Amino acid sequence: AGDRWPHLALRGAQYLDPAGQARLLRLLRWREAQARSSNRPRSWILDNELATALARTPPADPQALQDLLDSTPKAPRSLGRALWDALQAPLADEDAMPLARAEDLDKKRLRAELRD
């Protein structure tokens, strides 16, 4: 069923405000579902960089999103409407979402280094 909080694994998430992290979580969960249903790698659906950029600065409307997708290499142009819907629709468990913080990622990296 995938990771419940996939945004915590993304380095860029720590630089987003809580609303941005919620948008990123929506996009990553949508991407996971799309990848599973189409049997494609997640990065083919929506790469981490574009997901983070959309979460940081969400487009004003569906046309602005489509224009951005049309001008971005490897963007999911044909999925613009579904991507817009995913970006806009709050998740039922967003209120329980832990926030990505720089110190958490640093602790995780330190633990990994100590194990090696």
Question: Where in this protein do the model-derived segments appear?
Answer:
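Accessory DNA-binding and partner-docking regions appended to nucleic-acid-acting proteins
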Residues: 1-116
